[in-house]
Amino acid sequence: MSSENKEQHNLSPRDLPEEAYGFPPELPLGAQRGSSTDLRQFEPSDRRRAFRRIHMELHEKPDTNIRQLVMRKLQKSCQCNATKIRNRIFDFFPVLRWLPKYDLKKNILGDMMSGLIVGILLVPQSIAYSLLAGQEPIYGLYTSFFASIIYFLFGTSRHISVGIFGILCLMIGEVVDRELHKACPDIDTTSSSIAMFSNGCVVVNHTLDGLCDKSCYAIKIGSTVTFMAGVYQVAMGFFQVGFVSVYLSDALLSGFVTGASFTILTSQAKYLLGLSLPRSNGVGSVITTWIHIFRNIHKTNICDLITSLLCLLVLVPTKELNEYFKSKLPAPIPTELIVVVAATLASHFGKLNENYNSSIAGQIPTGFMPPQAPDWSLIPNVAVDAIAISIIGFAITVSLSEMFAKKHGYTVKANQEMYAIGFCNIIPSFFHCITTSAALAKTLVKESTGCQTQLSAIVTSLVLLLVLLLIAPLFYSLQKCVLGVITIVNLRGALLKFRDLPKMWRLSRMDTVIWFVTMLSSALLSTEIGLLVGVCFSMFCVILRTQMPKISLLGLEEESEIFESISTYKNLRSKSGIKVFRFIAPLYYINKECFKSALYKKTLNPVLVKAAWKKAAKRKLKEETVTFHGDPDEVSMQLSHDPLELHTVVIDCSAIQFLDTAGIHTLKEVRRDYEAIGIQVLLAQCNPSVRDSLAKGEYCKKEEENLLFYSLSEAVAFAEESQKEKGVCVVNGLSLSGD
């Protein structure tokens, strides 16, 4: 507890002697009660005063008629001319602005190199992440291909890489598994829409006059979720509600990604061991999965285990070398592609699937499947799941685009980014794709290899197109354990966030707690619940910060007019009889009692002083033989009008962002309590919003507007001048009247 809390004016009627409340004999019994300051004697025209008041004239506010405002907005929006149409089209398709101005000599080499490298990295990652989403490998390649082209058309960031993303694939996979489980166990063999065959559950689609097996139904679910996520993102862009992302702080997003990374690692562990286990969903899926793994550990496929260990021994050190020598290497070593090629050749020629029952990727078709609309009947089942997926997708995309734009000195439009990522989901959902977003790891690679514009995304899509048309079938023998290793190794960045915790703790303990809560809930409960818990806990922390604000008494620096906290800085002095109080938070219904109790504790409690005066006066009445007429309480207060050393309380409102009704009532109550014992209350450095609230709340009358000041120095000077005008001086801590 600071020394400020031990104020000599914190009075109590029980622990202070009666003599402390004695009144000087010359004090008239009929002293006039009321406001402690006669404001009429301090009119601005009074030339006798040394004090000079600052006056600032407000701009006239325009008429805020809602109907007229809406009509003006509509007229402005509905105006149509050639220039406006052109600007709207160019804003919606940013590529039309920058592509005609493209500097071929300056940018083409960097764009081609970065696009080629990112495309090479995306091939194995797209195949691996498709398994995470419960899809066939070809759908991961489709997703990255279409996302690259569409972001090229709609995006405003020059550097981010948009494509398949592990966290979103995990969330898609959980929805896919849940819907498959709902469709297959509860089979009605008499139904015309679902039938059970010996090889599993098959869904009949009458509109296509054909059968839809597990793989077909899984991509229907995935594409429907993707479509809904894109619709939400475009809607948020249209209604300009990008502010939602501000509730996803850096600490929350980092904790969520790290927690989800544990879930991803857990889901891929079975591939590393070659175990065939059902996927666990719902609350506690991580714990349930590990229980299943340890129960079946004796069924480990030795071939898959050895392959996984060899891949880890190659990938992990190479990733570290790429990171260590990134400033010296012209491009990162494409270790993942090398491992995929080597593992595929070893599996093919070693016949690992036939000889050791090693699980492989299987047939990957070439070319493109015919476009197909999402399954509209699934929308009610997945609409809620798509909300969390859409928010995470656009939050990561917008934050990365703004981060790299700031780094390279250009601007991005957040709402256009939401349109871009939304269309990266809506359009590909008709081409058997799953949800996409920007990814930090690939964006860093793209930037470090010389990317200048989004033309590099076209180069990336050409690499993926080559794989889709020619190379994809060659991955038939690729072991799934290799894909699992690639997925786990790419979690390295998220898992290494633990190294940043000591620094985060030193910077902000609250952010560290938010990180831990979000991470643990995402890992131990589920990704959706973890995100919800993180957002709710962050909001609670914001409220907690306003409910427990920083408070301090201010002192004056000797050689300036700067007021700062006495408990923080040395060599500050307080003006005699004046207390300057600072409250660093908005004043509203949640913290009104905190404000009041802190103010009374730091300065003087007027309620206790008034009670002590009454108590002392009643005892004094019993001893006096004088006959008083009138109300006993009135007489008590007249008798006990004890002069105090403190005559003014100045409240520094510079850190009070806003007031609500409860806050205004609290200020009125505080002022009334202090003026009842002869102490004036002044407000200084109120922002225009606070001044407007005080005026609307009738905090002071028209003639009392002098109680509001633009600076602390002005308020303190006014307080000193008012005491001089009253003819009151302070001697040995007692105020003596000059009357």
From Swiss-Prot:
Highest taxon in the source lineage: Eukaryota
Domain STAS: 568-719
PTM summary: N-glycosylated.
Alphabetical UniProt keywords: Cell membrane, Glycoprotein, Membrane, Phosphoprotein, Transmembrane, Transmembrane helix, Transport
Tissue specificity field: Cartilage and intestine. Expressed in the kidney (at protein level).
Coiled coil regions, renumbered to chain: none
Region annotated Disordered, chain positions: 1-44
Glycosylation positions in this chain: 205, 357
Compartments in which it is found: Cell membrane; Apical cell membrane
Biological role stated in the UniProt entry: Sulfate transporter which mediates sulfate uptake into chondrocytes in order to maintain adequate sulfation of proteoglycans which is needed for cartilage development. Mediates electroneutral anion exchange of sulfate ions for oxalate ions, sulfate and oxalate ions for chloride and/or hydroxyl ions and chloride ions for bromide, iodide and nitrate ions.
Name by which UniProt lists this protein: Sulfate transporter
Originating species: Rattus norvegicus (Rat)
Lineage of the species this protein comes from: Eukaryota, Metazoa, Chordata, Craniata, Vertebrata
